[in-house]
Curated annotation (Swiss-Prot):
The lineage of its organism: Eukaryota, Metazoa, Chordata, Craniata, Vertebrata. This is N(6)-adenine-specific methyltransferase METTL4. Changing S42F: Found in a renal cell carcinoma sample; somatic mutation. It catalyses: a 2'-O-methyladenosine in U2 snRNA + S-adenosyl-L-methionine = an N(6)-methyl-2'-O-methyladenosine in U2 snRNA + S-adenosyl-L-homocysteine + H(+); a 2'-deoxyadenosine in DNA + S-adenosyl-L-methionine = an N(6)-methyl-2'-deoxyadenosine in DNA + S-adenosyl-L-homocysteine + H(+). The gene is METTL4. Keywords: Chromatin regulator, Cytoplasm, Methyltransferase, Mitochondrion, Nucleus, S-adenosyl-L-methionine, Transferase. Belongs to the MT-A70-like family. Its EC number is 2.1.1.72, 2.1.1.-. It comes from Homo sapiens. Transmembrane segments: none annotated. Signal peptide: none annotated.
Length: 472
């Protein structure tokens, strides 16, 4: 389970365990060496390739049958069934020390009047900083003042609740004290090259001819599929309904598709296939690319304005009483926008605010709690779609618990940018079982979930995984 410990304050999660619990097993057909002919079923075209058996031995994507019958070769014999298992690279969760050490943080804070942060926020605060040649006066803007006030309100909640969960993690051995010899052995992590820019492909796909809206917008990965076009991948929801992992090869890059998962790879302007999916969802998790100064400077990924986020068709995607969860940065401007504008425009009532607290493997905050620059926590705003019609609820006889406020989700963050921890297990007491679940702006897939985004396959890249065992 991804939940290592659960207390009244919240949960201590093991993100890596959750990924590996998915059980990424690839089932391949392996012919004995005496075979006469090479058996492959491949579809090739200019920019997309889908294989049944790849030359590297990794099973690929258009077989979703759960049948255990072994196919016959040309001699009438059977191919051997070969199983290969993959796990997520554990070094991507090796966060052995804080991103900013407390000593460095303390040195940076020596010239600041820390009492102003803890003893109340005033409308105008100025700090005299003595430079090498002259004094300069730093005045906090309103956004910074609001952030200080918000931090003051939740600081003790974050500190006390996190320490309780961290202590449990240290007792159980999930978290461990950092010894000097462990830190010396750390090596730089080599990440896969972004040779296949998914977002750029989605941008190009916008110029493909659109399908008739009345057409069925779903592509099931089944054995009978004989041809696939670019339009099939980019303009349809793709499903792996089998109990096994599949692989697709896109622009020469391989991506693992977990069992019982589905996805739509598209730009925000091409969400119509998701609306034509003939499904509404009981849980919708949103991780918008919020606009901020650092994103503008880095050009690492595109961002959306509040107006663009507001235009996401949540009312058409949400089932009655749908639980909506939105990840949000610590900017008070974004928090107010969700609570005062975004959710009301979608007829969603705010019911709780939770906090994701990021720690190291030894239980330290990844940033000093009182750092004026970056905090070791992020927020989640939870809301319920308000009833507008007399439509019957799915599983209306199933009772779910009311959602408590200010719960903590404490975990070691993945070193990959914006790879959020899973919410399935922490939400299970507050949602109906066997519901329909959707993640928007997703960068990975989950069994039982539909995922959408222009980088929806990003963290499914096979290079993020390691083959750990094989057998027949």
């Amino acid at each position: 389970m991804s939940v290592v410990h659960q207390l009244s304050a919240g949960w201590l999660l093991d993100h890596l365990s959750f990924i590996n619990k998915i059980n990424y097993q690839l089932h391949q057909h392996h012919e004995p060496c005496c075979r006469k002919k090479e058996f492959t079923t491949s579809v090739h075209f200019e920019s997309l390739q889908m294989d049944s058996v790849s030359s590297s031995g990794v099973c690929a994507a258009f077989i979703a049958s759960d049948s255990s019958t072994k196919p016959e070769n040309d001699d009438g014999g059977n191919y051997e069934m070969f199983t290969r298992k993959f796990v997520f690279r554990p070094e991507l969760f090796d966060v052995t020390k804080p991103y900013i050490t407390p000593a460095v943080h303390k040195e940076c804070q020596q010239s600041n009047e820390k009492e102003d942060l803890m003893n109340g926020v005033k409308k105008e605060i100025s700090i005299s900083i003595i430079g090498k040649k002259r004094k300069r006066c730093v005045v906090f803007n309103q956004g910074e003042l609001d952030a200080m006030e918000y931090h003051t309100k939740i600081r003790e909640l974050i500190l006390d609740g996190s320490l309780q969960l961290i202590q449990e993690g240290l007792k159980s051995g999930f978290l461990y004290p950092l010894f000097e010899k462990q830190d010396k052995g750390s090596k730089p992590i080599t990440l896969p090259l972004d040779a296949c820019s998914l977002s750029e492909l989605c941008e190009m796909a916008k110029h493909l001819p659109s399908l008739n809206e009345m057409e069925h917008q779903t592509l099931q990965l089944v054995e009978e599929d004989t041809s696939v076009t670019e339009q099939d991948l980019f303009l349809r929801v793709v499903e792996n309904n089998s109990s096994f992992t599949k692989v697709i090869t896109l622009m020469g890059q391989k991506y693992l598709l977990p069992p019982k998962s589905s996805f739509l790879l598209s730009d925000i302007s091409c969400m119509q296939p998701l609306l034509n999916y003939r499904k509404t969802f009981d849980v919708i998790v949103i991780d918008p690319p919020w606009q901020n100064k650092s994103v503008k400077r880095s050009n690492r990924y595109s961002y959306l304005s509040p107006l663009q986020i507001q235009q996401i068709p949540i009312p058409k995607l949400a089932a009655p009483n749908c639980l909506l969860v939105t990840w949000v940065t610590n900017r008070q401007k974004h928090l107010r926008f969700i609570k005062e504008e975004l959710y009301p425009s979608w007829s969603v009532e705010v019911v709780a605010e939770w906090h994701w607290v990021k720690i190291t493997n030894s239980g330290e905050f990844v940033f000093p709690l009182d750092s004026p620059h970056k905090k070791p926590y992020e927020g989640l705003i939870l809301g319920r779609v308000q009833e507008k019609t007399a439509l019957p609820l799915r599983n209306a006889d199933v009772n779910v618990l009311p959602i408590p406020d200010h719960k903590l989700i404490v975990s070691v963050p993945c070193t990959l940018h914006s790879h959020k921890p899973p919410l399935a297990e922490v939400l299970k007491d507050y949602i109906k079982p066997d519901g329909e679940y959707l993640e928007l702006f997703a960068r990975n897939l989950q069994p039982g979930w539909t995922s959408w985004g222009n980088e929806v396959l990003k963290f499914q890249h096979v290079d993020y995984f390691i083959a750990v065992e094989s057998g027949s």
